[in-house]
Amino acid sequence: MTAHVTSGTGTLTAHMLEHVVLTMALAPLLVLVGKRLLRFLPTRVARLLVRLGSPPLGWTAFAAVTLATHFTGFYDYAVDHEWAHMLEHTLYLLTAVWFWWPVLGRRWRWSVPYLLAAMPVQAVVGVVLLSSDRLLYEHYRSLADQHRAGALMWFTSSLVMAAALVWAAWDWLRAEERRAVAREVYGR
């Protein structure tokens, strides 16, 4: 996924597409597959992985990596240094899996507020790129490209998170309905 950057012919929009695919497509898919694979792990390992999936830590790590890589000199550095670029992608994927785990990896009653709190983080980066009247990264020379990259990040991350939000709200409502029926039928 890094050839366009190292060749010097890439666009920020293409680079942003890589990030969106890693965090908003690949990571959720890995979580959906991963939760099914947990049953094949030794019980202790599976429990440890579930415990490490702390929602506040996952949210914080994902937000911190997103903001730090886009609003510090790290982004320019990563474009010029392949090892840093690979580290950047690894951090995006790992923190995104960590972020998505509470929402997709198990039923969690706080999924709706968790997603609502995460949406602005992605939106801020997208809006800053979209609305800036100056180039934010040395490697890229087109303000129009930067604006497209910002729109791509803002729109796609908002769309994916909104879809996840609808799913989480629906799942929560179904669970509440089941609990209400159980209370009515069994007096619990």
Residue ranges of model-derived segments:
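Alpha-helical membrane segments of multi-pass proteins
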Residues: 1-188
